[in-house]
Amino acid sequence: MRLAVVLPSRGLVFSRTVEEIVREVRSVDCEWELFMAHSRPIPECFNEPIAAGMEWGATHFWLVEEDMAFPPGILAELIASGAPIASADYPVKPGVMCVNRDDEGRVRHSGTGCLLAERDALERALPFRTDYWYIVSDRGRTWTRQRVPESAKGLTYGMHDIEFGMALYHRDEPIHIIDTTAGQRRVVREATPKRNDQGWHDIEEVWA
């Protein structure tokens, strides 16, 4: 396996997240390389490092976002699933998970915080894009795809993961969700400048 670890940072990353990424790739049998984005918007922060990984010759891509928390063995579980595209669920806020399913249990979309994709499957789903959104009605049963109006551009966040997942869903190639969940990190208090005794960030982890 030739694994491209894609970290679509827009400028910052949690240090423990980096430690966990290194721990995970060292725990599996693969040749790996890290591809990062720096100070780039969504979706360019995804598409550009993925393109670099394609050029490098990656056979698999592990998308890992900069604020994630990874339990030991999560990458091995993604690989062992054998799915063309597999993802771990994680909370977007306390008590609210990322994965969305239809009434039959099929995955409409997951987040891109911990997602493993085979090269061919990823190429068929690219590029990530944010120029469409979905209007959800009928108590979550009906999803209508619409182009984001000019008046709303610049006022939205994300949606690349929803567009990505829904494209796979409509092709009857839904994302596989592994049993293990990941977590997210957030800053509770920023370090106080020029104070040794308060020179660190207080960071909390949110899990399922």
Residue locations for each model-derived region?
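C-terminal catalytic/acceptor-binding lobe
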Residues: 129-208
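A short, glycine-/small-residue-rich helix N-cap motif at loop->alpha-helix starts
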Residues: 40-45, 157-158
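Short beta-strand-to-loop acidic/aromatic patch adjacent to the donor-nucleotide binding site
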Residues: 58-69
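Conserved catalytic core of nucleotide-sugar-dependent glycosyltransferases
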Residues: 50, 71-146
